[in-house]
Amino acid sequence: RRLVAGDLAGLFDGPSTVRFDPTLPMLSLDLSRVTENATLVSVLMTCASAWMESALLDPAGGQRWVVYDEAWRLMSHPALLRRMDAHWRLARHYGIANMLIFHKLSDLDNVGDQGSAMRALASSLLANADTRVVYRQESDQLGSTATALGLTGTEQQLLPTLGTGQALWRIKHRSFVAQHQLHPAELELFDTTGRMTSNDSAHLPSEEPSGGLS
């Protein structure tokens, strides 16, 4: 009813304004403008997943990475979580590698209730990851991160000391510290600090008048 006559009416009543082209080297679905509407996110991701699966089922589609940024947000929707689980189980059949991205592992606390089937399913996706890449963690996250990922004491102590672009790589039972380098073209695409580092002073507050409070 919401899709036909309610607040979501008109969004899915006609052809898409964007063509899903699986021949492109990379496709990104940006949900940043709808993240406050959980129902809309769920519907959009369901449609996008149907697009994606049609491309993955193409025998001539080659191999692909499927990247889930802010993964906890998608995992909070049961249907999407089950679809992600299917992609994990059928990864070899689809010719894909899956990547989950979290700010911190405690984000999983947003997925279902403690002890629920949803929480267990989300945790199993993490447990089935052969490669874990962990960037610097704050001290209040160290215990839960170490427990969830099975880190050694040395690895746990290393995490708060990592610098920008440095990460602990856990591959099976081996670990490495890597310094990641971005190509300028990659930095232009993925730099999320642009507004904080801009030299544009047009919107900066002027200096306080003499005697003003700060």
Question: PLM features: what roles do these ranges have?
Answer:
Residues 1, 8, 12, 105, ...:
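Generic structural signal of hydrophobic/aromatic residues within well-ordered alpha-helices
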Residues 1-96, 100, 158, 167-172:
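P-loop NTPase motor domains
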Residues 16, 165-169, 196, 213-214:
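Compositionally biased, intrinsically disordered low-complexity regions
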Residues 44-46, 148-150, 183-185, 195-199:
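Short intrinsically disordered coil segments
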Residues 78, 85-183:
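Conserved ATP-driven motor cores of ASCE-family P-loop NTPases powering translocation/secretion/packaging/pilus
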Residues 186-190:
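C-terminal alpha-helical "lid" subdomain
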Residues 192-214:
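Acidic, low-complexity intrinsically disordered tails
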